[in-house]
């Protein structure tokens, strides 16, 4: 088979000009082919959709505008269908329809590769699905790091999600793992320079759990609130590191308790994120030059 010579020439020129990789993080397909998506969305912005009930206070349909990329976590994909998605817990905790949606690019820890999904019976009970994560469309796998270092968070070759209960992180915090840490690390790896936070309430109560229906026992609510306090300390410590790498995180969650990042109104964030692709579209003249207008007929001689 003859290959296209212009494609070959462009490939050779690109390989010759390629700069050394600055981010050693690798992703893996279900067949464990190694890929890098470093800088894939270079310089763009994304909305990180967490699960706080304040999600119900904003018009999420605005996120369907051209130019806007969203990343969901956990079951926030039941509230808004994201472009990207990630998790750190067992895959069976997350709604199977999201897993089966080929239009959502999913980033998943490698240990979840062979784990089963779950489905819900009509009576609300759960059972194992016939499908495993590796059989789902649009899935990439990543390796996690078990140590959080606020001075190296964006530069390692794996994805930090917190520490185990026996070892302290760079701030002296033990445990306190979170999918939010993973999402921010992945978004930076993908090249996003600005991340807008939604559903980042950083407080949970018996009457304010999630943006979707779900039960939470009192001890789980206490655990989450303790986690939020530790994450707030980590994010305060990360601010100089983020500034050094020109990575902006902006909180657009109404009533959020997280004060580590600057706040912005949701509508203003949508306007900024969609501006580049928000101009009116004309389809004329892209395939062929527009025909010149016919000259105006001359006035009849008198």
Protein language model annotation of sequence segments:
Residues 1-302:
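Metal-ion/cofactor- or nucleotide/acyl-coenzyme-handling active-site neighborhoods
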